[in-house]
């Protein structure tokens, strides 16, 4: 009951309003505010009133402008970078090593036989189109050549270049390896290009190269990709270099290790790669002390004599340092170690800590990235490299209907090959050169908020020396093959020393350049400096704004009611009827004394007594008027709120 009464009083108070007009409210505010200036506007003479009004208006505008600048600066989410140094025992990084050649030529030669013969014929026609000493003629399988051939472009007349096919004598899918007919261009006057055509052959593009070496290497790699994509990965692993052949010796600190301490993964570019201290199944190994004596020492046998001649032109080992449980993108971030040398790598650690939303677009674990991570099968952490490659593979599947061999294969998809997807090379070339595709993937992928980078200082020296070369190679050969029949040579061994230079690590951390404390202090400082105000002054100003809105709403409601009343008066002309008029409109004429009512003939019932006729009508109260139902009378306690 009390709550209902209290709510009713509150409703009456809302309907009544502040009880001031606009002018009275402004005068009250100027007299009572703690802000300097408004009080002088109403207390001084006319000239000073105008002066103080202009000054107050100017400084108010200046404060609002400064507030806008500070708020815009705060909403720009700028960061400041701090660099700090630390010293502690650190976990040794994961080390990935690969051979520069992905496969042993002795094991893949049967797959590349036709391609190698075609490659030799291509080189003959490029290098000696008219003066070849090849007397024997052999038949070549040019089925793969028909999909992506190499051509010579004669640009002696730049306005009308001439395209010459290297195998102009192709008939029924085969070609002779003898030189082609004399051409009007030589190797100095022509450029080698790769012709890529769509499925029906109506649209063709030419990928130009500045050197014939680049052209034939890219062409051979494209054809080899087509071949290896049709071989099961289990067989490819067997054709690559096994760990027991690649890793001859291993030492971590003072503890010996072997190839069994490495985790094997298959990389499409480098075949079998081996990761030390990956941390997938065991705890990461710490480094006891900085210095070369407490790092990882490896001796590798790259087996250069068994390299694929046209697939790999670089000899050595490829290695990369990375975090535990992260996938090694060794093609993009790795370095080469040259054969016949001892490569020493000193490591310094940088830790990056980025601010997340809204300061940057980084992600903690990649769960908020709208790209399917194709490297999740390796159970590795998120990285922007994995995201970009997964995004490219998705676009490859959408545009070319097949997946590229160099990237993980999604479930239910197939790798591209010439037999099932004849125009995949044309589609892949366009997609790889597409700027829109790269921008799409870069915008969709995010950097990792926390990252560790390993800065390397690399030095090299010949190893072994001429004085110790014989006995070292004999000992290594005996340890590897348990016999001295096979002797290693300088061109096939690589020695690596990987160690921490020092235990000092750098932490590069982002922090908010402008936080909420900075914003409030600057807003308050500007307001206090220019107008002598504080937070209470803002509350006072907010109060008067609420009162202004309150009065405006009451006036609008009253105006709406007056419009409704005017419409009602226009519909029913004249004053409303009185109670007496309403009663007369419904009078029962049986009660009227001056109206004779027909009755029975007196002669019929002579002895019947005649009763008086009741004719007293209700009184006519002309003073009673009908009251509108929507009018609510305020009680005497309405102002008590």
UniProtKB/Swiss-Prot annotation:
Keywords: Cell membrane, Cytoplasmic vesicle, Disulfide bond, Glycoprotein, Ion channel, Ion transport, Membrane, Phosphoprotein, Sodium, Sodium channel, Sodium transport, Transmembrane, Transmembrane helix, Transport, Ubl conjugation
Extracellular topology ranges: 72-533
Sites bearing Phosphoserine, chain numbering: 634, 636
Keyword Acyltransferase: no
Taxonomic superkingdom: Eukaryota
Record Gene3D superfamilies: Acid-sensing ion channels like domains, YojJ-like
Region (Disordered): 593-624
Gene Ontology BP annotations: multicellular organismal-level water homeostasis; sodium ion homeostasis; sodium ion transmembrane transport
Molecular-function annotations in GO: ligand-gated sodium channel activity
Main localization, broad class: membrane
Transmembrane residue ranges: 51-71, 534-554
Keyword Transport: yes
Residue ranges annotated as motif PY motif: 617-621
Membrane topology: Multi-pass membrane protein
Reaction(s) the record says it catalyses: Na(+)(in) = Na(+)(out)
Known glycosylation sites: 141, 261
Cellular compartments per GO CC: apical plasma membrane; cytoplasmic vesicle membrane; plasma membrane; sodium channel complex
Compartmental location: Apical cell membrane; Cytoplasmic vesicle membrane
Cytoplasmic topological segments: 1-50, 555-641
Entry PTM: Ubiquitinated. Can be ubiquitinated at multiple sites and undergo monoubiquitination and polyubiquitination. Ubiquitination by NEDD4 or NEDD4L inhibits the ENaC channel through endocytosis, intracellular retention and degradation of its individual subunits. However, some studies could not confirm the ubiquitination of this subunit of the ENaC.
Stored PANTHER family: AMILORIDE-SENSITIVE SODIUM CHANNEL SUBUNIT BETA, AMILORIDE-SENSITIVE SODIUM CHANNEL-RELATED
Function of the protein: This is one of the three pore-forming subunits of the heterotrimeric epithelial sodium channel (ENaC), a critical regulator of sodium balance and fluid homeostasis. ENaC operates in epithelial tissues, where it mediates the electrodiffusion of sodium ions from extracellular fluid through the apical membrane of cells, with water following osmotically. It plays a key role in maintaining sodium homeostasis through electrogenic sodium reabsorption in the kidneys. Additionally, ENaC is essential for airway surface liquid homeostasis, which is crucial for proper mucus clearance.
Protein family membership: Belongs to the amiloride-sensitive sodium channel (TC 1.A.6) family. SCNN1B subfamily.
UniProt-recorded name of the protein: Epithelial sodium channel subunit beta
Species assigned in the record: Canis lupus familiaris
């Amino acid at each position: 009951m009390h709550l209902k009464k209290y709510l009713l009083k509150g409703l009456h108070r809302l309907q009544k309003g502040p009880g001031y007009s606009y002018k009275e409210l402004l005068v009250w505010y100027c007299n009572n505010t703690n802000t300097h200036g408004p009080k002088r506007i109403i207390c001084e003479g006319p000239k000073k009133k105008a002066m103080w009004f202009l000054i107050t208006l100017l400084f108010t505008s200046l404060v609002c402008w400064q507030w806008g600048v500070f708020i815009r600066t705060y909403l720009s989410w700028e960061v400041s970078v701090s660099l700090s140094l630390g010293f502690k025992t650190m976990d040794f990084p994961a080390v990935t090593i690969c051979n520069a050649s992905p496969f042993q030529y002795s094991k893949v030669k049967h797959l590349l036989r036709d391609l190698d013969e075609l490659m030799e014929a291509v080189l003959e026609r490029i290098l000696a189109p008219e003066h070849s000493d090849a007397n024997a003629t052999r038949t070549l399988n040019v089925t793969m050549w028909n999909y992506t051939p190499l051509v010579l472009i004669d640009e002696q007349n730049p306005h009308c270049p001439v395209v010459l096919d290297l195998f102009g004598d192709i008939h029924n899918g085969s070609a002779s390896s003898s030189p082609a007919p004399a051409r009007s261009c030589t190797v100095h006057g022509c450029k080698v290009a790769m012709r890529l055509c769509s499925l029906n052959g109506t649209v063709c593009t030419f990928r130009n190269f500045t050197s014939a070496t680049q052209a034939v290497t890219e062409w051979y790699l494209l054809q080899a990709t087509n071949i290896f994509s049709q071989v099961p990965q289990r067989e490819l692993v067997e054709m690559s270099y096994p760990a027991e052949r690649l890793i001859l010796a291993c030492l971590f600190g003072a503890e010996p290790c072997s190839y069994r301490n490495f985790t094997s993964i298959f990389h499409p570019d480098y075949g079998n790669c081996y990761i030390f201290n990956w941390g997938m199944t065991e705890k990461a190994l710490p480094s006891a002390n900085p210095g070369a004596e407490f790092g990882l020492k490896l001796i590798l046998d790259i087996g250069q004599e068994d390299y694929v001649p046209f697939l790999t032109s670089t000899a050595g080992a490829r290695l990369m340092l990375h975090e535990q449980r992260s996938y090694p993108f060794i093609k993009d971030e790795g370095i080469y170690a040259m054969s016949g040398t001892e490569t020493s790598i000193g490591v310094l650690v940088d830790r990056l800590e980025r601010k997340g939303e809204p300061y940057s677009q980084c992600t903690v674990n990649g769960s908020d990235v709208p790209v399917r991570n194709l490297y999740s099968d390796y159970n590795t952490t998120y990285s922007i490299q994995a995201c970009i490659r997964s995004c490219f593979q998705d676009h490859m599947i959408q545009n070319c209907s097949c997946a590229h061999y160099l990237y993980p294969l999604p479930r239910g998809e197939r790798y591209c090959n010439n037999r099932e997807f004849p125009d995949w090379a044309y589609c892949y070339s366009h997609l790889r050169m597409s700027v829109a595709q790269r921008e799409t993937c870069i915008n969709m992928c995010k950097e990792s908020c926390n990252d560790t980078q390993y800065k390397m200082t690399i030095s090299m020296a010949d190893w072994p020396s001429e004085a110790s070369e014989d006995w070292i190679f004999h000992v290594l050969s005996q340890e590897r093959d348990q016999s001295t029949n096979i002797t290693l040579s300088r061109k096939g061994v690589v020695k690596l020393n990987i160690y921490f230079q020092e235990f000092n690590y750098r932490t590069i951390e982002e922090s908010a350049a402008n936080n909420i404390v900075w914003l409030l202090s600057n807003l308050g400082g500007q307001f206090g400096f220019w107008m002598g105000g504080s937070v209470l002054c803002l509350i006072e100003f907010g109060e008067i704004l609420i009162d202004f809105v309150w009065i405006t709403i009451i006036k609008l409601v009253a105006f709406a009611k007056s419009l409704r009343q005017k419409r009602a008066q226009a519909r029913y002309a004249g004053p409303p009827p009185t109670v007496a008029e309403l009663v007369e409109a419904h009078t029962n004429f049986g009660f009227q004394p001056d109206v004779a009512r027909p009755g029975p003939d007196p002669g019929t019932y002579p002895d019947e007594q005649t009763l008086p006729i009741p004719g007293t009508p209700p009184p006519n109260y002309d003073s009673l008027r009908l009251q509108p139902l929507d009018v609510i009378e305020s009680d005497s306690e309405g102002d008590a709120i």
